[in-house]
Every structure is written in C-alpha cells, then in structure tokens.
Amino acid sequence: MRRSIAIPAVLATCLFFAACGEDDSDTPTGDADPKVIEVTIQDGTVTPNGERVRLEQGQDVEFLVDADKPGELHVHTDGEGQTLPYNQGVSTLDLALDEAPGQIEVETHDPDVVVVLLEIR
C-alpha cells in the first residue's frame, strides 16, 4: 500500500518543480526582427552621425543606404570586422551579428564619420 502512495507523491513533486522552472522567454534568441537603420550620404554629409542604436544580443541589422556615390560602411567588431560596400543610389546591406554585449562602431571613411554606435544588450 505504501508503494501505491509513494508513486503519485513523487509524480506530484516532479510536476510541481517542473511548473516552477524559470521561463526562458526573456533570454535573447536572435529571433528578433532585424533593426532597420536608414543612412543617407549626400554631398559629404552623413545622417545619422554618431547616433546610438540599441540591439538585442543576436539581433541582425539592415542598413538602407541612400548615397550619391559608391562607398563602404566599416563595422568594427571584436573579430576582424566587416566591410559592407554600397552603390550609388539606394542599397540594402544586411549585417548578421553574433557578438557579446557591448558597443560596435559603424563608420565610413569618405567622409570619415562614425555613422552609428550599435549597443548590444
């Protein structure tokens, strides 16, 4: 008789602790929609210019660049960094980030400007 009482008690205890487990919904998964950043480069003027942009860890970025001549965005990550070339006119540049929390500069060298500072949280 004790065995028949012990089994339901153990099962009930397991279910109780399983229900009390942490919810992982606050953990970044990289499934967030890409952050769209519009960049305009016209007559030597760049907008945005040094603006801070917050990202979730694992969130990708999509740059929509409207430029009066071809050029490159330089992304300074912990590794070797990345170069994203753009054409004259409107270009869409996709940036996949797999970085730890911190800050990443995105700049152009013609003109020499920090376009955005990505803050990964």
PLM features per residue range, with description:
Residues 52-69, 92-99, 104-105:
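Beta-strand cores of secreted/periplasmic/IMS beta-sandwich domains, seen most often
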Residues 7-13:
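Sec-dependent N-terminal signal peptides
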Residues 30-60:
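N-terminal edge beta-strand
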Residues 1-7:
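Bacterial N-terminal signal peptides that target proteins for export
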Residues 22-26, 35-40, 88-121:
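Extracellular/periplasmic metallocenter environments
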Residues 15-19:
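C-terminal motif of bacterial Sec signal peptides marking the signal peptidase cleavage site
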